[in-house]
């Protein structure tokens, strides 16, 4: 079994149970989860891995070419909205615990990171990430981008570079990944995954982890195709993944 070792600073996580919020350290959360779940073993699938990489390169390059007018138009709209950079980048944790810089269209005001600490008490996500309804940091253009998932399109560059895959567990920032088991890092992170099409941020942290582990166990070209199809349906139905 392949293992991944991470060494990040300790943080504190909040767990909701009804109206009760309990504070746990990362070590407590990890210890409790690992005690209830066996680590996932990564099965060797060399043929699948080669085909997956080829399809990632071909599909991401084709998508960038096809959507280039849209990408340029979105970039211009963001700059006109508040004169800031259209691209937002952030360090995320990828395969084998390696850091990489993820790209997105900027959907928030330029001081969004500085304002996040003041909003932590309003976090509605049951998973590892941060989400609140009517986030005041989101711009008018950004609201449209998020509703249509267009803000994620620059990650096609990450896929082309090899940092990510089209399908795989979503990558988190170091402090968030610290709260999660390392075995979800056995494969490349993806643009979409099981839990994004099966409940998204409404799922609990353990449910998201279970679905990531399910993908690692079931990964195949057919599984990837099914997730891609359901992701497209979610986007066109107005459900933000």
Task: Tell what function each PLM region has.
Residues 24-28, 88-136, 192-211:
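Short, glycine-rich, amphipathic interfacial segments at transmembrane boundaries or analogous
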Residues 1-65, 217, 239-241:
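N-terminal hydrophobic signal-anchor/signal peptide
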Residues 43-113, 183, 221, 226-241:
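A hydrophobic, helix-centered structural microdomain
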Residues 128-188, 227-235:
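A short, structured surface patch at a secondary-structure boundary
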Residues 178-184, 188-241:
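Cytosol-/stroma-facing membrane-proximal "stalk/adaptor" domains immediately downstream
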Residues 22, 32-33, 153-159, 197-198, ...:
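Hydrophobic alpha-helical segments characteristic of transmembrane helices
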Residues 35-45, 120-125, 135-138:
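Short glycine/proline-rich turn/loop motifs
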